[in-house]
Amino acid sequence: MSEDIVRQTINNNTKLNLKKPKQKYLQFDAYDKNYIVEIKVRNTHYDKQIIEFSKYAFNSKYAKINDQIFVYAVAIKDIIYIFNISKLENDYDFKWEWRKLPATTEFKNNDNMLKYVGYLNLADAVTTIKIKE
């Protein structure tokens, strides 16, 4: 599964019209006039999903400055879990901590590095979308 499939599935199942940013190396993977969306595609199901503080902080601030909502979309197998981070950030306990994790999720770089991360319980997703193949 790819970010493109996730973005298109979200568009097909909501009123959003998400586009892929033209700029490289942004902290988010999709946007429309009201939302910015960070997309994660995971191969393994865990009840708690990691969110990196660097992406959380940048995207939360970027969304506020641009009067948008920051959404985190996690695709696991055939389900997309949607989190409204802009809403959660007010009172959600992300349980932030330092962890040694792979530098990237791509297999090119298996080196571990220290990252400040939090956790999202899948049960706290505002909605889920089934991916149809």
Question: What positions do the PLM features span?
Answer:
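Beta-rich catalytic cores
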Residues: 26
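Non-catalytic C-terminal interaction segments of nucleic acid-processing enzymes
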Residues: 22, 31, 75-133
